[in-house]
Design a protein with these regions (language model features):
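Conserved short beta-strand elements that form part of the metal-binding/catalytic scaffold
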Residues: 28-70, 125-129
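Conserved beta-strand-loop-alpha-helix junction that forms the acyl-donor binding cleft
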Residues: 9-10, 37, 108-110
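Vicinal oxygen chelate
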Residues: 44, 91-131
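Mid-chain, well-packed structural core segment of small domains
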Residues: 69-93, 97-99
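N-terminal beta-strand motif that seeds the catalytic metal site of vicinal oxygen chelate
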Residues: 1-16, 77, 131
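Amphipathic alpha-helical segments
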Residues: 13-29
Length: 131
């Protein structure tokens, strides 16, 4: 299991606003805002239960040592959801915030209930509920 996942985005404000609204639907909230005056920095999202957490960044956060460009290969990140209704809200709110549909809410392999979106930078994000 991982401790955290961090991804660099082109626009911290736009991506931060997007993830703040979408992740709230599945019980994940903004925990820390390290936005700098020049628009770079990072945001930490989580449930407040320590780990794992998700980092949205722009520019090069001081704790990263590699290139700060958004990836040319989109990421696929799946978030646990507390219910089917939360998956539905995640999908609906995401579409309203500018994401593209990459899979309507529904039953998937193994009996999970999931929905998929393409975020503002082309990453495939998913909300999954497993009963």
């Amino acid at each position: 299991m991982f401790s955290h996942v961090g991804i660099v985005f082109r626009d911290l404000k736009a991506s931060g606003d997007f993830y703040r609204q979408v992740l709230a639907q599945i019980g994940i909230r903004l925990l820390e805002d390290h936005t700098q005056p020049d628009g770079t920095g990072w945001l930490v999202f989580g449930t407040g239960n320590s780990r794992p957490f998700f980092v949205v960044a722009a520019g090069r956060p001081s704790f990263w040592t590699e290139s700060s460009r958004p990836s040319s290969s989109p990421a696929h990140i799946a978030f646990d959801a507390p219910s089917r209704e939360a998956v539905d809200r995640f999908h609906s709110v995401g579409l309203g915030c500018g994401a593209a549909n990459n899979g309507d809410p529904g039953i998937r392999h193994g009996g999970s209930y999931a929905a998929f979106l393409i975020d503002l930078d082309g990453n495939n994000i998913e909300a999954t509920y497993r009963s």
